[in-house]
Amino acid sequence: MMRLLLSIWLLGCTLSFPLLADEAPDLAARIRYQDRITGNDGIARESVWQEKWLRVGNQVWSQRLIPLPLARAYHATHDATPGHKHFTHQMAARWVTLDDGGDLQLRYADAWHNQLVEEVPPEEYGQVAFKPDWERIRYLVNPALLQEMTRLDEQAPEQARWYEKREGKQRTRILWSSRWQLPLVVESASLDGYRSYRMEVTLKPLPRQLPWQQLDSYQTLDLRDFFD
């Protein structure tokens, strides 16, 4: 399955996409991911998760939706463990900004502990599994990928189109919205049906107050403050 996910990222790394709008509209969304693989033992294993996602200007905020009882239990165990505390980036909201100079700033907001990790240096991106691909962060997939794909004449929402690419033993499909400048659906699957991945975007109203405007009371930290 990792090969499927990597193919989506690699196919569109450096190309340009002429239909891409100069300004991407501000959006709020809920994203659902589904990852399924059938192993050699015949057992199908499926992972399903969701996240809140927000794009405003050159800022993108994403936060995995974790049921409160599970989050409470995790933090109770983690915080009660003696010794140095490590940063669990999966439990925090990720905040990525592109500055005027074209540089990315990566931050994490931990609402449970009221902490803002405002400095994640590039050499530590691997610690939080972060890939500094702004096109992919801003648009969920690199729009250049569409140039490698075939446009399909299938039913789709207004100002949206299905695209498909078959390569080797797998197929990738993207439902791209030119209006919203992002994919509404991404599907990738092996042709034998034993591996599949799906991402589905549901648009939501923009919040009245942006999440990064609510961090004044947060303690400011550097990611390296969590290192042993």
Features from the language model and the residues they span:
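N-terminal signal peptide c-region/cleavage motif recognized by signal peptidases
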Residues: T14-P18
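Positively charged n-region of N-terminal signal peptides that target proteins for export
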Residues: M1-L4
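Short beta-strand segments that buttress and anchor functional surface loops
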Residues: I31-T38, S62-P67, D79-H86, Y108, ...
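An acidic-aromatic
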Residues: V48-D133
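A short, amphipathic edge element
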Residues: R45-S47, R136-R151, Y194-Y197
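N-terminal cleavable signal peptides for secretion/export
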Residues: L19-W61, L65-A71, L221-D228
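A structural detector for short beta-strand units
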Residues: E46-E51, M91-V96, Q170-I174, G193-Y197
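Non-transmembrane domains of secretory- and envelope-associated proteins
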Residues: D22-A24, L146, A156-A160, E167-T172, ...
